Amino acid sequence: MSDIKIGIIGGSGLDDPKLMKDKKEKKVKTPYGNPSSSLTIGKIDDVDTVVLARHGKGHSIYPTGVNYRANIYALKKEGCTHILATTAVGSLREKIKPGDLVFVDQFIDYTKHRTLTFHDEKVIHTPMAEPFCKDLRSLLSKSAKELKLRHHPKGTVITIEGPRFSTKAESHMFRSFGADVINMSTVPEVILAREVGICYQTVAMSTDYDCWKEGEEPVTWEMILSIMKRNAENVKKLLLKTISKIKYTHCDTCKL
């Protein structure tokens, strides 16, 4: 469908010229400042696609410093109707192993210093009971099954401020909250996407067990990078297969 345009947030590798046709770089400015990176625009499987690096092209922006409003505004202005956002997460559950994919359906906001809305001048209470796009989640699960990838069709992510990792006490507390995975980037990204009416779904890759699990080495940045590099090709294949399905799908459930 010609009105479908997919935004990809995160380091997915989909800006590879072999995958993205008619590729071009576009620098944009927004009323909220500059986004984290230029937009890489092109077509994947004949679907208009826009790739944005959340933490900058060289991963130089820490989670609190990401200009989430500029990022989402830039994708909305570019005409994106859907967003697939990749992220590394720590597992808070035994069953979610390093390397597993999780298509989260709920979040808990444990951030402290982030702007959570576009609405600075008027009071808007955005419905958030179902914050992620169930249609995208279904397509991702279908694609993961076809590719025989270990995945979990739903889960709750808790987003912390960072950039430090959790203490053991915090990790156990987050488990008691009902969170399944932990990261530093989903909030406020998902909230802002809902405010502008974009279908949004997180593609979370488990890289570690945070620090709650006895007998497991506490998470380090090096550990995260190692698992991500090892599974990058799986994420790329998943996104490619899912994008080919989205072009036949138009979701109205995420529109306000």
Walk through the language-model features, giving the residues of each.
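Metabolite-binding pocket within alpha/beta catalytic cores that recognizes anionic/polar moieties
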Residues: 1-128
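Generic hydrophobic/aromatic pocket-lining and core-packing "Φ" positions
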Residues: 72, 171, 187-190
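Non-catalytic positions within long, well-ordered alpha-helices that form the structural scaffold/packing
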Residues: 76-79, 175, 194
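Short acidic/polar active-site loop segments enriched in Thr and Asp
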Residues: 81-82, 180, 199
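Active-site rim beta-loop-alpha module in soluble metabolic enzymes
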Residues: 131-176
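Zn-dependent metallopeptidase/amidohydrolase metal-coordination segment
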Residues: 184-222
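His/Asp/Glu-rich mid-to-C-terminal helical/loop segments that flank catalytic regions of hydrolases
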Residues: 211-256
